[in-house]
UniProtKB/Swiss-Prot annotation:
Organism lineage string: Eukaryota, Viridiplantae, Streptophyta, Embryophyta, Tracheophyta
Compositionally skewed regions (Basic and acidic residues) per UniProt: 18-31, 415-431
Disordered as annotated region, ranges: 16-54, 66-305, 399-431, 476-561
Name of this chain's protein: Protein IQ-DOMAIN 14
Pfam families reported for this sequence: DUF4005, IQ
Presence of the UniProt keyword Cell membrane in the record: yes
Subcellular location: Cell membrane; Cytoplasm, Cytoskeleton
Chief place of localization: membrane
Length: 668
């Protein structure tokens, strides 16, 4: 079907008023505006939306209409006010208007699917109907008398009815259908969608032209009986059928008698259309130029201008559509990308702020923890250093005290005065002398020496002596000495460890003394003691200051080496008498040496002792006496502790350490 916008633009070009006719056409324009207001919001039959773009070139019909306008100058005369009754039998004849071949602007009927009648296809040489007084009233419902169709080439009768102004009677009356034979005699083949425009009143181009109106019976006979002579426009239409067919893809369809039914019976409700310029009767009489004249800006609506601009736009092809779609997609994707980028940038900024704060807080906490750990470690290290320093100081002090004690073992820490110490030393010396006397007496008696049984069974010995013998094992078997040798031992051949001291078991000094066969020596004896003075003596004078590990000898060690008859328990005559019956007569004779009394007559005195750098010398000479001379017992200095016989230094036979003690020197 043909687009309606082109016909509407053609109608606008035909009926465009001039600026000088503005005052004369003012009432008509006002009535047109009033009509438009009544029909606002509805599209009339055949009207299209002006905002829809139309992509096509001008059709051949429009070109033909343009040529027809150039060939014929249509002059519209205003109709007379006294119009005969439209329903009269004989319409008054009208002189033929010079616009016989002028194209009639297309009515909105072009949208109807029916094939236009031959009378509608040819340009009707009808002069515009004179406006009746009712024409000024918009949408008049009274029927308008048809204008007489005089001087038509096809001997047209007056117009049966005005399609643009339906009357009330005809609108209420049922529409009369035209017989199919009315359009059959026309042999012209034209597209059903291309009706030729007919010159009509300005209201013919208005939307009211599409309203269906039943044709009057008076108007039909001239159309049916009188053959219409071919007009120049019809000839041109017949001459250019290929152009019509090429412009319209639809094939021609034979007219059917039912084609007019939709147009007559069912008028399409349409939205209001912008007011189109309507020419008044005086404007119809103005001569028309042969060429289409561009409408003035004041008379052409913006919609018409817009439609004129886009009418000749070519239809977009597939590459153009693809390019347009690509551009649209690119713009949309760019917009979405920018939007997402902005959102992402804000999110990243927010995350940076939050993470920066959290990282800062974590760093602060970590630094605090590290500072606390370092502080604790430093405190622990300082305490360890202090402990090590204190320990080193303690060890140093202990070593210093140990060194001082080791170098100053002869320190006397007693609170006694010098006189008291001297008196005690004198008493100890006297005790030692008494012990020597008792030992000499014991050595003169060999009863207990040759017979161990007599020693154990001797009831004259005190009880502690037997207990000590039972507690101390024998170091070596007691050698039996023959009579000719006359070898006398100073002490019993038993080790005498101290039960109260540990070091006394390790340090035993044996007295290696061999007496002559004649008599035991009771002369001066030399005792070699270790360099360290030994604090011994009777329990009566012991002060208990020596330690067990420092002093290997105790006062109790003298118990193991005590003679059977100490000085304070000298055997009486009765005791000797008791011992003599139990002894051997031979030993009894041999056990009493001749020189016993003589030996005891030379006891050592205090003035015979002298201090010799850690040793005691109890003789005028430091060498042994010969066998014939009064010998002495010598305790050599160079012998070790364990190589000096069986005699213990701490025994009663040993010398007191306080004998001849030097004055104390602290820093020696």
């Amino acid at each position: 079907m043909v687009k309606k916008g082109s016909w509407f633009s053609a109608i606008k070009r035909v009926f465009t008023p001039h600026s000088k006719e503005k005052l004369a056409n003012e009432p008509e324009r006002k009535s047109g505006k009033e009509k438009k207001k009544k029909g606002f919001g509805k599209l009339r039959h055949g009207e299209t939306n002006s905002f829809l773009p139309i992509f096509r070139e001008p059709s051949s019909i429009e070109k033909i209409l343009g040529e027809a306008e150039r060939d014929h100058n249509l002059v519209f005369r205003p109709p007379t006010p006294d119009r005969p009754n439209p329903y009269s039998a004989s319409p008054p004849p009208r002189p033929a208007s010079p616009r016989v071949a002028s194209p009639r602007p297309t009515s909105p009927r072009v949208a109807s699917p029916r094939v236009p009648s031959p009378r509608a296809e040819v340009p009707r040489t009808l002069s515009p109907k004179p406006p009746s007084p009712r024409a000024e009233v918009p949408r008049s419902l009274s029927p308008k008398p048809p204008s007489p169709r005089a001087d038509l080439p096809r001997s047209l009768s007056p117009k049966p009815f005005d399609r643009s102004k339906p009357s009330s009677a005809s609108a209420n009356a049922p529409p009369t259908l035209r017989p199919a034979s009315t359009r059959v005699p026309s042999q012209r083949i034209t597209p059903h969608s291309v009706p030729s425009p007919r010159p009509s009143s300005p209201r013919g181009a208005s939307p009211q032209a599409i309203s269906s109106k039943p044709p009057s019976p008076r108007a039909e006979p001239p159309t049916l009986d009188t053959p219409r002579p071919p007009s120049p426009r019809a000839a041109s239409l017949r001459a250019d059928p290929p152009r019509l067919d090429a412009a319209r893809p639809t094939t021609p369809r034979p007219p059917s008698p039912l084609a007019d039914a939709p147009r007559l019976d069912a008028p399409r409700p349409t939205t209001p259309k912008p007011p189109s310029p309507r020419s008044d009767p005086p404007r119809l009489d103005a001569p028309r130029p042969t060429t289409p004249k561009p409408p003035s800006p004041r008379s052409v609506s913006p919609r018409a201008v817009q439609r004129r601009e886009i009418v000749y736009r070519p239809e977009p092809t597939l590459p153009v559509q693809h390019a347009s779609a690509t551009k649209i997609q690119g713009a949309f994707r760019g917009y979405m990308a920018r939007k997402s980028f902005r959102a992402l940038k804000g999110l990243v900024r927010l995350q940076g702020v939050v993470r920066g704060y959290s990282v800062k807080r974590q760093t602060i906490n970590a630094m605090k923890y590290m500072q606390q750990v370092v502080r604790v470690q430093s405190q622990i290290q300082s305490r360890r250093i202090k402990m090590l320093e204190n320990q080193a100081q303690v060890e140093k002090d202990e070593a210093k005290w140990a060194a001082s004690e080791a170098g100053n073992d002869n320190w006397d820490d007693s609170v006694l005065t010098k006189e008291e110490r001297d008196s005690r030393s004198q008493r100890k010396t006297d005790a030692i002398i008494k012990r020597e006397r008792s030992m000499a007496y014991a050595y003169s008696r060999k009863l207990w020496k040759n017979s161990p049984k007599s020693t154990q069974d001797n009831r004259s010995f005190p009880q502690w002596w037997n207990w000590v013998d039972r507690q101390n094992p024998l170091a070596s078997p007691a050698p039996s000495y023959s009579q000719p040798q006359r070898d006398f031992r100073l002490t019993p051949s038993r080790l005498c460890p101290s039960p109260l001291s540990q070091s006394s078991k390790q340090h035993h000094i044996r007295l290696d003394n061999h007496f002559d066969t004649s008599t035991p020596r009771s002369s001066r004896s030399t005792f070699h003691t270790p360099s360290r003075p030994i604090h011994t003596g009777t329990s009566r004078y012991s002060r208990g200051r020596l330690r067990g590990q420092d002093s290997p000898f105790k006062d109790d060690d003298s118990l193991t080496s005590c003679p059977p008859f100490p000085s304070y328990m000298a055997p009486t005559v009765s005791a000797k008498a008791k011992v003599r019956p139990n002894s051997n007569p031979k030993e009894r004779v041999m056990g009493t040496p001749v020189s016993e009394k003589r030996r005891m007559s030379y006891p050592p005195t205090q003035d015979t002792f002298r201090w010799n750098k850690g040793s005691l010398v109890m003789s005028n000479s430091s060498s042994h006496r010969g066998p014939g001379s009064p010998g002495g017992v010598v305790l050599e200095k160079h012998k070790t502790l364990k190589s000096v016989g069986n005699l213990s230094i701490g025994s009663t036979a040993s010398m007191a350490t306080t004998v001849g003690r030097k004055e104390f020197n602290r820093f020696v």
